[in-house]
Amino acid sequence: MSGSEFESLEKTLEKHIPDAELKEVKRILFGKETKKLALPACAVEAASARDFELQGYLFEASPEQLRPPRTVRVGLIQNHIVLPTDAPVLDQITALHKRIGDMVDVAAMCGVNIVCFQEAWSVKNEPVCLKTLLKCRFSAMPFAFCTREKEPWTEFAESAEEGYTTQFCQKLAKKYNLVVITPILEREEIHNVLWNTAVVISNSGSILGKTRKNHIPRVGDFNESTYYMEGNTGHRVFQTQFGKIAVNICYGRHHPLNWFMYGMNGAEIIFNPSATVGGLSEPMWSIEARNAAIANHCFTCGINRVGTEYFNNDFTSGDGRKAHKDLGHFYGSSYVAAPDGSRTPGLSRTRDGLMVTEMDLNLTRQISDKWNFKMTGRYEEYAEELTRATKHDFKPNIIRE
């Protein structure tokens, strides 16, 4: 069975492990059992009719005497490119927006308050550029940064404030009263520079702000620094009606200090919109966001795209392999992790999907009070050592005979 045919780890465990042992296996792998969330019949029927997976789970906190529950529902959306890559561009643009609109519609049926799309999901759809885009065979921004080609991929970059994708998401936010996190390829017009950016749109429909990818990969086929460099927005946290949220884009999940700084700035939920493939990172995927939730007393949400994307021209990986036309299989498997170490099952590795998760944000403080990682963190000592380690004349503290 190829990686692109293997649907999910959870379903394989359920298929092959006896029930008596399965519960313990899941407890060890995934933490305490996450309760299933009852979803409206209309949403379940709509997801089935629109051919995408719908899952719902619940993280509870202990009742408190002085604080009411702070219940929030988040929706994670993973999706393929909609039409074949040789379909007319305008048809693909229409199809993709309909697809995402249909999935957000179901999220709204489920009472979702915050929805997040996968990394670089957006399309370019401004009339002034349509003639140029007729050369391109993708509707969604494919993860084309493996190719090192500038054209036509840079044509997908757009303004974070005024671009069509932002306007499209503003309408969704206002229509459904939800916060939308929309990762795009941004063109900053003042300096004419590209960035990998996530725009955060308030449930009022206004733009709350944007944040840029802090860490840029130079590994395998991920040649992203050919297009954009490390972000310059720091570790912004956005105060929304539904809690304080942050966006740690893709490769940033490999850097513990990146998660740490979002947590230090007060994030209660950190989203990790990604585009990553099985041959490179899948063994790490189920671990990293969960570890970050534990270490930083917060909820984390990993979102990954699905499918295999093929390009017209061959490209190489710098590893001696023959030139090839695809990056590998994007394995989906989006999930949510809680500060107590528990996590939801992942969405499918092969299908479009919507993960709806209800969480009580009171759990973040309760777990912080229990484990005291921030109290016992000794940040001042580490700050001093890190400062020394960044100096050109740093000498490691190694004791020898």
Show which residues each predicted segment covers.
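Short beta-strand scaffold segments in enzyme catalytic cores
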Residues: 182-184, 196-200, 236, 302, ...
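N-terminal active-site segment of His-dependent metallophosphoesterases
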Residues: 57-113, 271
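Short, acidic, Ser/Thr-enriched surface-loop or helix-capping motifs
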Residues: 126, 201-203, 337-338
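Active-site beta-strand/loop signature of hydrolases that rely on acidic residues for catalysis
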Residues: 74, 103-152, 173, 180-181, ...
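C-terminal beta-strand edge segments of enzyme domains
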Residues: 1-69, 304-401
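Acidic, glycine-rich loop-and-strand cores that form catalytic or ligand-binding grooves
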Residues: 292-301, 308
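Active-site catalytic loop in hydrolytic enzyme cores
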Residues: 158-161, 167, 171, 176-178, ...
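Short beta->alpha transition motifs characteristic of CBS
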Residues: 129-130, 140-148, 199, 210-217, ...
